[in-house]
Amino acid sequence: LPLSYGVVCVLGLCLNVVALYIFLCRLKTWNASTTYMFHLAVSDSLYAASLPLLVYYYAQGDHWPFSTVLCKLVRFLFYTNL
């Protein structure tokens, strides 16, 4: 599980940053599908950003050394973006 989350994190962050750059810097006109794709890239970026902490959690044998607030935030980002 940590390996797959790590791959998804790296690819997800890199490719979504490229997509966000294209949406924000290259596209001149937006329509409904462009807005949808932009929001999808933002959502996927938030999901991918939550994965490094989950990789650490699972690699340490289900031990969460961070705060309870951070735990809830990571789980919120993870589950709302599935």
UniProtKB/Swiss-Prot annotation:
Its localization reads: Cell membrane
Q: What species is given as this protein's source?
A: Meriones unguiculatus (Mongolian jird)
Ranges of the Extracellular topological domain: 57-75
An example of a Pfam family matching this protein is: 7tm_1
Please tell me in which tissues this protein is expressed.
Answer: Expressed in brain, heart, stria vascularis and vestibular labyrinth.
Q: Which GO terms describe its cellular component?
A: plasma membrane
Q: Which GO terms describe its molecular function?
A: A1 adenosine receptor binding; G protein-coupled UTP receptor activity
Family assignment? Belongs to the G-protein coupled receptor 1 family.
PANTHER family documented for this protein: P2Y PURINOCEPTOR 2 (PTHR24231:SF17), PURINOCEPTOR-RELATED G-PROTEIN COUPLED RECEPTOR (PTHR24231)
What is the membrane topology listed in the Swiss-Prot or TrEMBL record? Multi-pass membrane protein
Q: Which residues cross the membrane?
A: 1-25, 36-56, 76-82
**Which PROSITE patterns would you find in this protein's record?**
G_PROTEIN_RECEP_F1_2
- Asked if the record carries the keyword Transcription, the reply is no
Source species taxonomy:
Eukaryota, Metazoa, Chordata, Craniata, Vertebrata
Cytoplasmic compartment ranges equal 26-35
Q: What does this protein do?
A: Receptor for ATP and UTP coupled to G-proteins that activate a phosphatidylinositol-calcium second messenger system. Not activated by UDP.
The record's keywords, sorted A to Z, are: Cell membrane, G-protein coupled receptor, Membrane, Receptor, Transducer, Transmembrane, Transmembrane helix
Q: Report the protein name in the record.
A: P2Y purinoceptor 2
Instruction: Identify the domain of life.
Output: Eukaryota
